[in-house]
């Protein structure tokens, strides 16, 4: 669609969301100290049968334990949930095709049949994830992939190899501040919204929301599709030079009838001129 728009005789802006795995980075202290994480993440992964664009489809954990119990507990939490059918049979068919492809992973994939859908959880090493770029592509449905990092250096490498995302989540403890100072700048270049100690599936409609991100999360990371600032997608800049006061829009007239905050000669003011 983007290519078609650019081929128009008069091209127009095109705003699209094209794919995001919404990575969740869990530092080792958090993995070991917060026993509620598997339940919270299982609910987020399977919300709406995994059909939310903000679903956490990638969970990057730092855990020195090679047989991480976190993956086992997350799989058990997903097993305990009953899921509704997906919204369309073709979507469900495509999802199952993706699961069959993922079964060839050099890792483990845990599946659980639920009504018309399959909740699934994969587990691979950081090294294999970095060497296999298509593992970072979105799988639409109740699936998530755990990437096991044995140390912080591996987590930083995983973060660096990711493409643009709608969201990225950092789960940590107060003791992890120094590690976050290194990780956060990498994440800032990858995502439109960064969460701390939460899950990304909730998208509030308010002035602060940013729902968009660097390519391929969206076609233009400067805009949001949710919240009051979403209106800017349908606006364009326009200036009036040496225009008679009476011909200006009311919001720009010297009298400032709406008492708006305006920048006049570099100073914010709501007074009349």
Please name every model-derived segment.
Residues 49-52, 56, 83-93, 109-113, ...:
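Flexible, glycine/charged-enriched surface loops at secondary-structure junctions
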Residues 1-64, 110:
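Conserved NAD(P)+-binding/catalytic subdomain of aldehyde/semialdehyde dehydrogenases
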Residues 16-18, 28, 63, 125, ...:
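Active-site proximal loops enriched in glycine and acidic residues that flank catalytic Cys/His/Asp
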Residues 248-273:
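Extended hydrophobic packing segments that form well-structured cores
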Residues 39, 61-167:
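NAD(P)-dependent aldehyde/semialdehyde dehydrogenase
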Residues 21-26, 141, 216-219:
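Short beta-alpha connecting loops at secondary-structure transitions
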Residues 152-154, 160-248, 270:
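C-terminal core of ALDH-fold dehydrogenases
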């Amino acid at each position: 669609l983007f290519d078609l728009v650019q081929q128009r005789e008069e091209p127009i802006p095109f705003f699209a969301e094209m794919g995001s795995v919404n990575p969740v980075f869990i530092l080792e202290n958090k993995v070991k100290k917060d026993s509620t994480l598997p339940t919270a993440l299982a609910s987020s992964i399977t919300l709406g049968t995994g059909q939310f664009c903000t679903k956490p489809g990638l969970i990057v954990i730092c855990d020195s334990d090679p047989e991480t119990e976190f993956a086992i507990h997350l799989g058990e939490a997903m097993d305990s949930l009953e899921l509704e059918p997906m919204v369309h049979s073709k979507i469900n068919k495509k999802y199952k095709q993706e699961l069959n492809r993922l079964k060839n992973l050099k890792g483990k994939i845990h599946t659980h049949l639920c009504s018309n859908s399959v909740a699934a959880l994969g587990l691979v090493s950081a090294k294999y994830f970095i060497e296999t770029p298509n593992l970072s592509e979105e799988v639409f449905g109740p699936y998530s992939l755990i990437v096991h990092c044995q140390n912080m250096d591996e987590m930083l490498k995983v973060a660096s190899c990711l493409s643009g995302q709608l969201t990225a989540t950092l789960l940590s403890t107060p003791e992890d501040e120094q590690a976050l100072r290194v990780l956060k700048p990498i994440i800032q270049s990858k995502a439109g919204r960064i969460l701390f100690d939460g899950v990304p599936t909730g998208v509030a409609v308010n002035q602060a929301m940013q729902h968009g991100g660097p390519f391929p999360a969206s076609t233009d990371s400067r805009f949001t599709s949710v919240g009051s600032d979403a209106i800017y997608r349908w606006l364009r800049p326009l200036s009036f030079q040496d225009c008679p006061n009476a011909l200006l829009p009311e919001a720009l007239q010297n009298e400032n009838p709406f008492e708006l905050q305006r920048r006049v000669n570099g100073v914010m003011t709501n007074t009349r001129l």
